Amino acid sequence: MEENKVEKQNINGKQEVVQIPIIVSNSYNKKYYLDERLNVLPREVKDTLKIIFVKLTEEVGGVAEVSFDNTEYDLVFKTYKNDDDFNYDEINANYKLSKIEREYAEIFSQIAEFCKFKLNGLV
């Protein structure tokens, strides 16, 4: 699955990645992506992440994405849709995503800590 990296220009004029997608579930092409660097997570955690994000996109449509923001050292949760998708339920998608954030806060906190070191080359 193609990564949807968000980049910005740093002080030296070079492009640097700001948000790195680590989890993506896409209802349009029925695909799920987990960044390969997260393969070290326990199997049950990876399975849980897949279940909750695939279920979310099956219920509300569109794409659900969790990215690591390497300037804020935090996870960014978002959902979005294709322009021609009139069945996407934005309000319900954002509500359910917020609920997932709260319900699995401990797991996401640990993933954010892992990403802070692993994705920033501090390990």
Regions found by a protein language model. Give the residues of each.
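Intrinsically disordered, low-complexity regions
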Residues: 14, 62-63, 122
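Amphipathic protein-protein interaction modules
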Residues: 57-115
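Non-catalytic accessory regions used for complex assembly or targeting
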Residues: 2-5, 122-123
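Negatively charged, low-complexity tracts enriched in Asp/Glu with abundant Ser/Thr
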Residues: 4-59
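A broad, low-amplitude sensor of folded, mature protein cores
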Residues: 34-47, 96-97, 102, 111, ...
